[in-house]
Each structure stands twice: as structure tokens, then as C-alpha cells.
């Protein structure tokens, strides 16, 4: 049986009509040098700054140095399988992270991938990790309080929503504890928290996650972690990933608290990358743009106006000092970028004053306008009194014949120090802080022995909860101080039942 020529030609025509010429064009370069998490590639002439590049083994990289003949790439993953001569391909995408509600309650790495073993995260949106900060006209001045639940902070260095408040101090002085207590205190405050751990031990991060879970705070918290064992590029990217997640919520009109723990390690990781990329070193071998690294990150924290639904990001960056030296390079940089700093001192910490906040060196440049009226009234002079007490205390060590006024100031100062002490993971609601600070500043604690102050406080606040809730409710609802008569009546009544130690 013969095949007709027409049939053959119609079959060929049919095949030609169905043929789709799919030609995939991608720009490919060649790795010419590799080592220490950095690759140098030739041939990617049109690569963009910060573009994602894909190596032949599937590992991603990020274009950092764009030079005439080659591109310096930081590798975002294991680099041991990449060799000279391997292909590296442009993706045309800028580095992005997944964002959205689905991340809440999860622990992720700086690329947004889950590391808590609880399955994949099905997000639908992503945001670029680098985006310009909002301009002047999109912002609003800080005016709403962010209650940390820590008496020493809410009274002396108040923080407002949209503020950047640096927490600075040596290692092991309770910086992380301040942040965790602040996160725990946001329960019921309609606040989303993001904790970014940079270069921490994995065991430490695990401890933080367990603390948050135990107190139910993981229900409104995202943990972003780049552990000490991970490559430097991930440590450098972690804060940017965290703030991109925060911006998504801010643009929906929500309030976000983001903690960077800590930026000294991010600066070290960036220094490592820059030196490996052969960028010229500056002071303390940091690259020239290390200030810009932190300023562009922290400027993304803002309080937005009505046009952007009044959302806010409040940032608590940490910086670790060496032997209390706050005049080093990174500390002075971040102090000049932020709206104030809380200085934690190891001497105070070791002498049992915890949180170890140095009232003299700590300052909040914009938080005063966000403080509630009740707190303003009771804590107005507290800062100055405490600073004066520290001065008098060192002076009083040398002389015994002090006049009555000086002695009274010293006694009041000792009680102030006791009242500002606080246990770990026990944040205090603002109405209770106001009650105990009222008792202190109005002289109601002057006849209580110093060693009984802590016990007096806990018993008095429990007693108020049961017997005089009107005082607490008034502050909670109106943000104003309850009438003096109510406080005096409550204190007088309670003091009759309080047993002083001998």
C-alpha cells in the first residue's frame, strides 16, 4: 500500500503548524575564583547590584561587586561544591523574602525558609529585602506609647511606636532579657513582634523561642535566625529580611516591634564580606559604608500617617560594647542614627540591680511625647533624682556627717533603686507601674525598710488587684492619674496590714 504525496505534505504542514520554537535565553557567566563564601565570575556584564544569581549546583548567590571584567558574588549557602569553571546564571530577580500572616509563630532563616521542623510555610507574597525608607511627608511624629513592661524603661526612657531605641551594653548584662520582656508585654496590645537573632548560638535562640512559647508570645511573634555557624552573607541579610517582613504589616496599618540582636555581629559579618570582596578597609577595618549599612536599615522603622493607615515599626537594635566603651566605632554610629539609647552597665548588673539600666547615660529623644499623662506625673523628676542619688552616693562614702536633707535624698534614692528592680520575664502593666511609682515619689515608702521594698511592692499590687481595682482601672481607661485621695486611702489601708521585717 503506497502513501500518497499529498498525505505526506499535509502531515508535514500539520507538524510545522504545531511546532513552537521556544528558545530560552539566559545570561551565563563562568566562575573564575571561589573561596570563603565569595565567588568571582566572568561574563555577567548586565548583572544588577544585589541580583540573585544561580550556580550550576542550584545554590544561589547575590551580586555585590560589579566591576568591569567580573562580578563579585556572595554565596547564600554551602559553597564547597562550587568549583572554578562552573556556570553561574542570571535570574533577573532581586533578593526577596516571603512575607505575610503565615509567618507568625514560626522560626525562619534570612531567606524565609522554616527551620523549626513544622513543615512548609505557604505564603503568597514576597517583598525585596532592600527597599527605600519612607520619606518625610509619609511620616508622623511619634505619639503613641509602646509599653515595655519594665518600670525603669517606661518611667525613665519611655519608648513610642515608630521610635528606634538602641539597647547597648557589654555581653551578659541582660540585653536580650529586656527585649524578651518587651515582647511578652505586647500580649493583647495588637502588636506583631519580630525577633531577629544575628550570630547567636543556636542553643540561645532555642531558649528564646521556648520562653516565648511558654508565655504564649509566639502567637504574635516571628523569629528570624542566622546562627553563628551560618555563612556571613546570611548574618548580613538577616536584619533586612526581618524589616521587610515588618514593612508588609506596617503597610496594612498594623504596629510592629522588631528586635535586632545584635547589630555588632551584623557589622562584623559585613566587614568579613567586604574584606573578602577586596573593598578598601576603613576605621577598625570596617568598610567605608558600614554607617550606611545601619542607617538604611534603621530608617525603615517609622510611624506612618493616615495615608498609609497609621502603621508603625518600632526598632530595638542591640549593640555589644567591649568593657563598657560606648565611644567605639559601631556604638557611636548607631547612637547617632537612633532616637535614644538604653545603656546597661555590668557594674550595676553584678551588684544586683536588674535590669541594669544606667539612668545617667540612657536617654529617649522622642519617647517623652508618647508617655501617658499618669506616668509623666509620677515619674517626671525620677530620672534627675536617680542621677543625683548616684552622685551623692559616691560622695557620701567619704563623709559621715551629712545634713538631714542629704540623708533624706540618699534614703529616697535607695528606695528608688529597689523599686526599679524587676524579675526576669515578669513585665508589669503600666497602671501597676504608676501605682508603685506614686507611692515612691509621694514619700509613702519612706517609712518602709529598704530590704522590704520589693516585698511591699508585690504584696501591694496583689492587694490592689483584689481590693482597689478602681485605681488601676482609672489609669488603664483614661491614661490619667487617679485622684490623690484614692491612692492615699489605698496606701494607708494596705500599710496597716503590711508586716515590716525587724
Swiss-Prot record:
Residues given in the record as ATP binding sites: 169-176
EC number: 7.1.2.2
Enzyme type, top EC level: translocase
Localisation per UniProt entry: Cell membrane
Catalytic activity: ATP + H2O + 4 H(+)(in) = ADP + phosphate + 5 H(+)(out)
Residues the UniProt record annotates as site (Required for activity): 362
Molecular function GO labels: ADP binding; ATP binding; proton-transporting ATP synthase activity, rotational mechanism
Keywords, sorted A to Z: ATP synthesis, ATP-binding, Cell membrane, CF(1), Hydrogen ion transport, Ion transport, Membrane, Nucleotide-binding, Translocase, Transport
Membrane disposition: Peripheral membrane protein
Classification via CDD domains: ATP-synt_F1_alpha_C, ATP-synt_F1_alpha_N, F1-ATPase_alpha_CD
GO cellular component: plasma membrane; proton-transporting ATP synthase complex
Pfam families (UniProt xref): ATP-synt_ab, ATP-synt_ab_C, ATP-synt_ab_N
Function: Produces ATP from ADP in the presence of a proton gradient across the membrane. The alpha chain is a regulatory subunit.
NCBIfam families linked to this entry: atpA, PRK13343.1
Family according to the record: Belongs to the ATPase alpha/beta chains family.
Oligomeric form and interacting partners: F-type ATPases have 2 components, CF(1) - the catalytic core - and CF(0) - the membrane proton channel. CF(1) has five subunits: alpha(3), beta(3), gamma(1), delta(1), epsilon(1). CF(0) has three main subunits: a(1), b(2) and c(9-12). The alpha and beta chains form an alternating ring which encloses part of the gamma chain. CF(1) is attached to CF(0) by a central stalk formed by the gamma and epsilon chains, while a peripheral stalk is formed by the delta and b chains.
Protein name: ATP synthase subunit alpha
Annotated organism of origin: Lysinibacillus sphaericus (strain C3-41)
